[in-house]
Amino acid sequence: MSASAVNVTPGRNVVVVGTQWGDEGKGKIVDWLTDHAQGVVRFQGGHNAGHTLIIGGKKTILRLIPSGIMREGVACYIGNGVVLSPEALFKEIGELEEAGLSVRERLFISEATTLILPYHIAIDQAREARRGAGKIGTTGRGIGPAYEDKVGRRALRVQDLFDARTFADRLRENLDFHNFVLTQYLGGAAVDFQATLDTMLGYADRLKPMVTDVSRRLYEENHAGRNLLFEGAQGTLLDIDHGTYPFVTSSNCVAGAAAAGAGVGPQKLDYILGITKAYCTRVGSGPFPSELYDADNPSRQDQIGITLANVGKEFGSVTGRPRRTGWLDAAALRRSIQINGVSGLCMTKLDVLDGLDEVKLCVGYKIDGEDVDLLPRGAAEVARCEPVYETFGGWKESTVGIDSWDALPANARAYLTRVQEVAGVPIDMVSTGPDRDETILLRHPFKV
């Protein structure tokens, strides 16, 4: 009997997105919310960004598998919007299984998910090397070239692995194209056909038990009354369409991508939680109006920025690269809120601001003397933005582990209240430390 026949109330779907340039602390919040979800869904990106979880003092970094895998009994889904490296997937599965977690029986992969192949990685790395000083900061893991193949309708997908002859024919055709680019344009070495074929087909039997029609399964789960959590990677300002182009990632990181990248109707997305760090960070190249510190730029060595980097442990969880740091940019945050239709914010890493004499909030910009209240769309224009700040008194008290609003220092509350006012949406959660218990809940995304 169908769910509708027995009049089951559909479950609630919550989307978690980063509102900055990634690294906002989404992993911890997804893990916290998973207490109230029966499934967690990845809908875009690949293994180029990591989610760091601290549970019981133990650090775990997940790059591809949804954070819900840390909770027994929670189903995890990799949607069609993801680009999948089987090598990275099975490495991560192995690490989790060594830690005693059950993975394969709870992980479901869309048959329409695009595969990352060795030639994607070779092209990614050769292209970035060729750019020299003009590099865009790719992780070199083949994400961008895999998405290029998807848009160019050349991509090999997970379901193609189960027809060896057709897979071989299409692989040979793809290699003819990509090896020409590698050798004749990028000056790299050709990728071997047989070695690639053997490697990829070797994953087929291991993948097959986890492959399913994810779109249908999510529909059925929702209509059976189960809550689903959609876990975004990277951040809105890295979105291929809405970010500081061309210094962006290769996928859509915004809330709307949850519908397309998992195969669910957009009206089924009930609540959008925007994750916002209490300050800003950025990895790699690209404009950053409120920047204070960049390890690679001698002109960006502000001591407060260095403090934020050190106290916040701002190093990429996958690449290890130091992150650039700066004050929270509310004008950029407003842009993200509008694009995503954010229902409420979760402010993370508030504790990193503890001990500062003053805290600044970028509320807009000056461009050629003109006032601008929203982050511009193009990188060239963003680079011309001069930040306009409001200044708040700092707080000397520690906020680490505080789990109620009233227990926060008065100046911390004043800062957060002003962020809400400028952003135009409520702060529904505040993170005061890396552990899942170090959280202030003001409104519950699954219960609003």
Curated annotation (Swiss-Prot):
Substrate binds at S317, V318, T319, G320, R321, P322, R323. Its EC number is 6.3.4.4. The active site is at D23 (proton acceptor), H51 (proton donor). The keyword Flavoprotein does not apply. IMP binds at D23, E24, G25, K26, N48, A49, G50, H51, T139, R153, Q234, T249, R321. Binds 1 Mg(2+) ion per subunit. It catalyses: IMP + L-aspartate + GTP = N(6)-(1,2-dicarboxyethyl)-AMP + GDP + phosphate + 2 H(+). Its main location: cytoplasm. It is found in: Cytoplasm. Pathway: Purine metabolism; AMP biosynthesis via de novo pathway; AMP from IMP: step 1/2. SMART domains: Adenylsucc_synt. Its cofactor is Mg(2+). GO terms for molecular function: adenylosuccinate synthase activity; GTP binding; magnesium ion binding. The keyword Ligase applies. Mg(2+) binds at D23, G50. Keywords: Cytoplasm, GTP-binding, Ligase, Magnesium, Metal-binding, Nucleotide-binding, Purine biosynthesis. PROSITE patterns: ADENYLOSUCCIN_SYN_1 (PS01266), ADENYLOSUCCIN_SYN_2 (PS00513). One of its GO terms (cellular component) is cytoplasm. InterPro entries: Adenylosuccin_syn_GTP-bd, Adenylosuccin_syn_Lys_AS, Adenylosuccinate_synth_dom1, Adenylosuccinate_synth_dom2, Adenylosuccinate_synth_dom3, Adenylosuccinate_synthetase, P-loop_NTPase. GTP binds at residues 22-28, 50-52, 323, 349-351, 431-433. One of its GO terms (biological process) is IMP metabolic process. Homodimer. Plays an important role in the de novo pathway of purine nucleotide biosynthesis. Catalyzes the first committed step in the biosynthesis of AMP from IMP. Belongs to the adenylosuccinate synthetase family. This is Adenylosuccinate synthetase. The lineage of its organism: Bacteria, Pseudomonadati, Pseudomonadota, Betaproteobacteria, Burkholderiales.
